[in-house]
């Protein structure tokens, strides 16, 4: 395990916000983490788990001990006629892992290509894109309890997946302990490894209009997994800025869901609103459209701005602070609520 002090975090968060960690521990194995918890001083200290840094907004220097997850490794752990189960260390880059599965001839994650972040963060956020979410391919994960050092395995039900949500995003109720089977593991668990079940035979997920357009443009009627992967990468690259060039955290707000009755009421006032019926009977509204309709595209608060090509993305125009990002986000939330009566929920965690 590598221990560092007064570590600049600009390179460790995709917004590129300037901040420091008082102490940063590079956790490269389960044994490294066990050693941290065996140290009485560090075991008792507050901790902040840092993966790929693609879903956080830093508003200042990080005082808790930063656990930088760098647990690597990829392998096939099971294979039969129905599915192949693959496992990756929590520190693996998500897109690189998706690419690796295709290189191994194991399709199923191609719709999730080019999503920033780490493998360990993918179930925390239940990342999803173009008709597929992590929960659709999830098998199980191993995590360590940061209070007790116990390692346990969670299945999909225990992870309590929801739309960009999981058990790892919620703290246990005050006075109660989070558990492997109960709700509330935020700040309590560190994910070590994640396993995904890739079903056989492979069937492409092409329900999204952008993918259907690519099929029409190319004349392909039966795409291969690699073609779907390439289309997804091209679509995302055209819509979203590269965080290596323009700091951002991808989609900043969740797409809100409303009842059909609420949707009809909004349509009566806003006939052009972009909306999608969901299998559970609710209606999902396009948060980017709501923000754009309120006139925010291209606007800024300090050096934090709304991306000109996609209003759902907030960007660092150069030297933005976390406070400016938060102020901009709150102003957008207020505008959308005042016009549509809808409360937008941010995706990134504010630290």
Residues of each region from the PLM?
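Anion-binding (especially nucleotide phosphate/pyrophosphate-binding) glycine-rich loop
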Residues: 1-148, 158
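Phosphate/pyrophosphate- and phosphate-bearing ligand-binding catalytic cores of soluble enzymes
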Residues: 4-5, 10-17, 56, 151-323, ...
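Beta-rich strand-turn-strand
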Residues: 106, 322-325
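Conserved ATP-binding N-box helix of the HATPase_c
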Residues: 336
């Amino acid at each position: 395990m590598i221990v560092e002090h007064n570590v600049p975090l600009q390179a460790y968060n995709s917004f590129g916000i300037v901040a420091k960690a008082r102490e940063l521990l590079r956790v490269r194995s389960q044994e490294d983490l066990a050693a941290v918890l065996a140290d009485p001083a560090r075991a008792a200290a507050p901790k902040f788990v840092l993966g790929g840094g693609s879903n956080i907004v830093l508003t200042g220097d990080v005082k808790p001990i930063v656990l930088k997850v760098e647990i690597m490794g990829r392998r096939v752990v099971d294979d039969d006629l129905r599915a192949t189960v693959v496992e990756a260390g929590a520190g693996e880059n998500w897109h690189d892992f998706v690419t690796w599965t295709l290189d191994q001839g194991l399709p199923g994650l191609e719709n999730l290509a080019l999503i920033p972040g780490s493998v360990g963060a993918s179930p925390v956020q239940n990342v999803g894109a173009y008709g597929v979410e992590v929960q659709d391919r999830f098998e199980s994960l191993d995590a360590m309890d940061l209070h007790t050092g116990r390692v346990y395995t969670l299945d999909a039900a225990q992870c309590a997946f929801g739309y960009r949500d999981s058990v790892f995003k919620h703290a246990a109720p005050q006075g109660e302990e989070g558990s492997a089977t109960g709700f509330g593991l935020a700040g309590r668990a560190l994910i070590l490894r994640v396993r995904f079940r890739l079903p056989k035979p492979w069937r492409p997920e092409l329900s999204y209009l952008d993918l259907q357009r690519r099929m029409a443009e190319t004349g392909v009627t039966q795409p291969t997994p690699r073609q779907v992967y390439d289309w997804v990468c091209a679509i995302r690259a055209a819509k979203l800025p590269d965080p290596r060039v323009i700091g951002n955290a991808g989609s900043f707000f969740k797409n809100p869901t409303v009842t059909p009755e609420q949707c009809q009421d909004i349509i009566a006032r806003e006939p052009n609103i972009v909306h999608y019926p969901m299998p559970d009977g609710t209606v999902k509204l396009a948060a980017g459209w709501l923000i754009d309709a309120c006139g925010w595209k291209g606007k800024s608060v300090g050096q934090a701005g709304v991306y000109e090509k996609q209003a759902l993305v907030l960007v660092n125009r150069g030297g933005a602070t976390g406070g400016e990002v938060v102020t901009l986000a709150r102003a957008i939330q207020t505008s959308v609520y005042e016009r549509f009566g809808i409360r937008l929920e941010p995706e990134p965690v504010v630290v």
